[in-house]
Each structure stands twice: as structure tokens, then as C-alpha cells.
């Protein structure tokens, strides 16, 4: 089962980093209404565009989403190796 985007994003938090993923992670951490239990791209993208209490470049979000998907694929491959 895939980790929610929020769960994965929280592993990317780093207040000292200027990387877009770290910035988004810190913004989302402080946003109490962010959809935490989903991995639905459309739902999260619409939330960031229409409802988030902060502004974030959606082009950068698309890149971060691709990184999230890549990590999910790697994690899945690693779990198969355990068996």
C-alpha cells in the first residue's frame, strides 16, 4: 500500500533547506486542513490551487509529485526483495 502524499512529504521537512520540497513540507505541516490521508493527485492539486492557506508554485508541485511517485515505486521494489 502506498504512503499518503502527506506522510511522504513530512519525511522531506528541513527548515534549513531552500529546496521546493522542503518548503512545501513546512507549509503543509502548518496547514491543519491539508488532506493528509490521500494519494490522489487531483484532490491535492485542487486543494493547493483553491483552498490552501498559502501560495505555492504548482509547477514545482508537479515535480514534487513525480518524486513522490518515484519513491513509492522504489519502496515497493524494496519490499518485494524482502520476500
UniProtKB/Swiss-Prot annotation:
InterPro entries: UPF0346, YozE_SAM-like, YozE_SAM-like_sf
Disulfide cross-links: none
Domain of life: Bacteria
Similarity comment: family membership: Belongs to the UPF0346 family.
Listed name of the protein: UPF0346 protein M28_Spy0369
Amino acid at each position: 500500500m502506498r504512503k499518503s502524499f502527506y506522510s511522504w512529504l513530512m519525511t522531506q521537512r528541513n527548515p534549513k533547506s531552500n529546496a521546493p520540497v522542503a518548503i512545501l513540507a513546512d507549509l503543509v505541516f502548518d496547514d491543519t486542513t491539508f488532506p493528509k490521508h490521500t494519494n490522489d493527485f487531483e484532490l491535492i492539486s485542487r486543494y493547493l490551487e483553491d483552498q490552501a492557506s498559502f501560495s505555492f508554485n504548482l509547477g514545482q508541485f508537479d515535480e514534487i509529485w513525480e518524486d513522490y511517485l518515484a519513491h513509492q515505486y522504489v519502496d515497493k521494489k524494496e519490499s518485494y526483495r524482502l520476500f
